[in-house]
């Protein structure tokens, strides 16, 4: 079974087993909902059930049914929380998990020519940007906007694009 990272436990918070986590998901409200079960990446058999959760600055605070004091919580420091593929859930049409976009071939929508592959994704503002790595070693960022990204074919691992002038160095 495949597992997906949703948070990294940074530190304890308070005396009753609460932990502060760095979020690694676009869906923290769903992933950290009361009753949701998470597992530890390095100990998949250990299930932790969310007792309560809340946003805290740029982090989240989580409390688990199974962790009741600071000493138990301290042992979780640095651990990665994951969900199984079955718990990942379905996304609406046109919305994709990052892992599905990584390593997709980038294809010129007009010519059908392969331009490279997506090797990184960043979320700096209103839309994501994707790093295209060409076979010749050149790299450039493209925005994930309708004017540029024309079609995403997850089954074939291909993204069809129409590059605006200036996005790709032609020298």
From Swiss-Prot:
It is found in: Cytoplasm. GO terms for cellular component: cytoplasm; ribosome. GO terms for biological process: ribosomal small subunit biogenesis; rRNA processing. Disulfide bonds: none annotated. SUPFAM superfamilies: PRC-barrel domain, Translation proteins. Pfam families: PRC_RimM, RimM. Residues 93-167 form the PRC barrel domain. One of its GO terms (molecular function) is ribosome binding. Its main location: cytoplasm. InterPro entries: PRC_barrel-like_sf (IPR011033), PRC_RimM (IPR056792), RimM (IPR011961), RimM_N (IPR002676), RimM_N_sf (IPR036976), Transl_B-barrel_sf (IPR009000). Transmembrane segments: none annotated. Keywords: Chaperone, Cytoplasm, Ribosome biogenesis, rRNA processing. HAMAP family: Ribosome_mat_RimM. The PRC barrel domain binds ribosomal protein uS19. An accessory protein needed during the final step in the assembly of 30S ribosomal subunit, possibly for assembly of the head region. Essential for efficient processing of 16S rRNA. May be needed both before and after RbfA during the maturation of 16S rRNA. It has affinity for free ribosomal 30S subunits but not for 70S ribosomes. Belongs to the RimM family. Binds ribosomal protein uS19. This is Ribosome maturation factor RimM. It comes from Lactobacillus acidophilus (strain ATCC 700396 / NCK56 / N2 / NCFM). The lineage of its organism: Bacteria, Bacillati, Bacillota, Bacilli, Lactobacillales. The gene is rimM.
């Amino acid at each position: 079974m495949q597992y997906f990272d949703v948070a990294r436990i940074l530190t304890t918070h308070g005396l009753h087993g609460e932990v502060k986590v760095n979020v690694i998901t676009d869906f923290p409200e769903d992933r950290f909902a009361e009753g949701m079960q998470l597992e530890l990446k390095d100990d998949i058999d250990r299930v932790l059930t969310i007792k309560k959760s809340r946003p805290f600055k740029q982090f989240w605070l989580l409390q688990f049914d199974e962790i009741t004091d600071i000493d138990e919580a301290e042992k979780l420091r640095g651990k990665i929380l994951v969900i199984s593929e079955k718990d990942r859930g379905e996304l609406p049409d046109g919305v994709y998990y990052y892992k599905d976009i990584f390593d997709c071939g980038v294809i010129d929508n007009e010519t059908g020519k392969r331009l490279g592959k997506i090797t990184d994704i960043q979320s700096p503002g209103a839309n994501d940007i994707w790093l295209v790595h060409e076979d010749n070693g050149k790299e450039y960022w493209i925005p994930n906007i309708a004017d540029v990204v024309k079609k995403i074919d997850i089954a074939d691992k291909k993204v069809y694009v129409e590059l605006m002038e200036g996005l790709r160095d032609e020298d």
